[in-house]
């Protein structure tokens, strides 16, 4: 199959666009419309074509369609037209997918993409160089172009791991121009997602977040073509003395959440440490527009509140499983048993990777260790958590999360003949217990083939990496961070 390659002219265009982006960061946001359009050229997206994925082991994640040991998926104009054992069409591209699993792309429901290039500065064996001190100190020195470069690097990793939707948990929005840069990066990379606008690192917890800037961003960016949605990420809430970035008062919560709700925007919140759920319930603040993150210390009463209010919970298995015992345990079993909506997320990639296969594996192993068969958990249920349930969490299950006619074509192909996968038995079991990101062969988002045969089809990854590396070096210098 012919793969799209960047010409020298395209690469020069991308370099010019980056310079335009840097200049644009110095302009008022209202003057950046032309600059934003030019910056999009730095990551040209492949066109949407009509094609049929042929002969794959299809896992639709739709109970009305089911699975096919050998099946086809027809895509046209970015949408799924049909899913069936055999689809015959003439004059369309055929993607041969024998010895591959065809499934919905993973939906990541919580990722601090702005920290992606800080990886060389973080360490797990040195508390002074852990995620919190590094991101807090360097976060204060971010420019819009740093935000752009970091988000693009993170989304490149997301695509390589089979994530087609990412919730960008942006808790370092230093200005509307920074938010604009992150949204541009999400759009330019062609990944579906939500951008949650948050307070800047280092902002005093008595100071309200920039609701006027949030409204400005909403006016500029929403509605769009359905690829991106908008929300807010709240700072920590309650009286916890362990929150490393402190907490905000309930009065400020009412002000900020009320401002978001006036704009009809969803809200997301970390709940590390003592749970604020009862506090929020007593204040009348919980609802189906709220997503919580890190279910580690909830009570049975709180889980019933979450179910009744329609609140969802995002689990970040890799990071959460490495926390000290006093921080709690991943309460997947308790959440499922209570009927709370649950999804999976990466959290950050400073000290680990985007790897949904590992996330599912950790959840299964911890579940078996804690509760065994008392609360059944199947491999298929875990794959559902990583795909359809993530779309439910983000409120976009009408367009993604499963393979069904009318939905947008967010699809991945996973090779089953690779040495770590073959010979394959049950496909769900293989995905959860055996698969790795390197097995992801093809990634399709909204009908655009962004990766094929394990390679980007159009993105100049070397450029993305170079810009992110330069950003990290510049941030370290501006912050006076030791090498």
Predicted features along the sequence, with ranges:
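A conserved active-site cap/scaffold subdomain adjacent to cofactor or substrate pockets
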Residues: 315, 322-331, 340
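His/Asp/Glu-enriched, well-ordered alpha-helical/loop segment
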Residues: 333-419, 434-437
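Active-site microenvironment of metallo-dependent hydrolases
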Residues: 2-71, 76-79, 86, 384-483
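Metal-coordinating catalytic core of metallo-dependent amide/deamination hydrolases
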Residues: 42, 177-304
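Divalent metal-coordination and catalytic microenvironments
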Residues: 56, 73, 78, 99, ...
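Alpha-helical scaffold segments that flank or form the walls of functional sites
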Residues: 119-191, 215-224, 469-471
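Active-site gating loops and adjacent loop-to-helix segments of metal-dependent hydrolytic enzymes
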Residues: 117-147, 240-243, 274-289, 307-313, ...
């Amino acid at each position: 199959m012919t793969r799209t390659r960047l010409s020298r002219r395209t690469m020069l265009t991308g370099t010019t666009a980056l310079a335009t982006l840097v200049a644009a960061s110095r302009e008022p946001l209202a003057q950046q419309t032309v600059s934003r359009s030019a910056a999009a050229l730095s990551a040209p997206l492949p066109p949407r074509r009509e094609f049929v994925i042929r002969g794959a082991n299809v896992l639709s994640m739709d109970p009305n369609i089911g699975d096919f040991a050998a099946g086809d998926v027809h895509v046209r104009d970015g949408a799924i037209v049909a899913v069936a054992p055999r689809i015959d069409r003439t004059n369309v591209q055929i993607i041969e997918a024998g010895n591959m699993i065809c499934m919905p792309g993973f939906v990541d429901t919580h990722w601090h993409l702005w920290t992606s290039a800080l990886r060389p500065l973080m360490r797990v064996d040195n508390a002074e160089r852990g995620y919190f001190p590094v991101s807090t100190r360097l976060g204060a020195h971010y420019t819009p172009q740093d935000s752009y470069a970091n988000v693009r690097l993170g989304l490149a990793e997301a695509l390589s791991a089979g994530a087609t939707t990412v919730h960008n948990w942006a808790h370092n929005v230093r200005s509307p121009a920074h938010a604009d840069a992150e949204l541009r990066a999400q759009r330019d990379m062609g990944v579906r997602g939500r951008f949650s606008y948050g307070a800047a690192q280092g902002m005093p917890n008595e100071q309200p977040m920039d609701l006027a800037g949030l409204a400005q961003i909403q006016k500029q960016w929403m509605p769009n073509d359905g690829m991106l949605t908008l929300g807010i990420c709240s700072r920590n809430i309650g009286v916890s003395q362990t929150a490393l970035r402190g907490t905000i008062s309930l009065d400020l919560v009412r002000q900020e959440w009320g401002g978001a709700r006036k704009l009809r925007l969803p809200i997301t919140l970390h709940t590390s440490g003592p749970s604020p759920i009862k506090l929020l319930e007593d204040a009348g603040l919980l609802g189906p527009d709220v997503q919580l993150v890190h279910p580690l210390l909830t009570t049975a009463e709180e889980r019933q509140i979450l179910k009744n209010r329609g609140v969802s919970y995002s689990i970040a298995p890799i990071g959460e499983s490495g926390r000290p015992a006093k921080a709690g345990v991943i309460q997947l079993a308790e959440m499922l048993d209570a009927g709370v909506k649950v999804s999976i997320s990466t959290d950050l990639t400073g000290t680990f990777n985007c790897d949904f296969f590992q996330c599912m594996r950790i959840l299964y192993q911890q579940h078996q260790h804690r509760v065994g068969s008392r609360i059944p958990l199947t491999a298929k249920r875990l794959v559902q958590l990583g795909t359809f349930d993530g779309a439910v969490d983000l409120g976009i299950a009408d367009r993604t999360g499963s393979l069904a006619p009318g939905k947008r074509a967010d699809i991945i192909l996973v090779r089953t003949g690779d040495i770590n996968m073959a010979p394959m038995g049950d496909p769900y079991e293989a995905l959860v217990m055996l698969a790795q990101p390197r097995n992801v062969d093809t990634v399709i988002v909204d009908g655009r083939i962004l990766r094929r045969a394990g390679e980007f089809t159009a993105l100049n990854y070397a450029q993305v990496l170079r810009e992110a590396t330069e950003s990290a070096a510049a941030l370290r210098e501006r912050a006076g961070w030791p090498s």
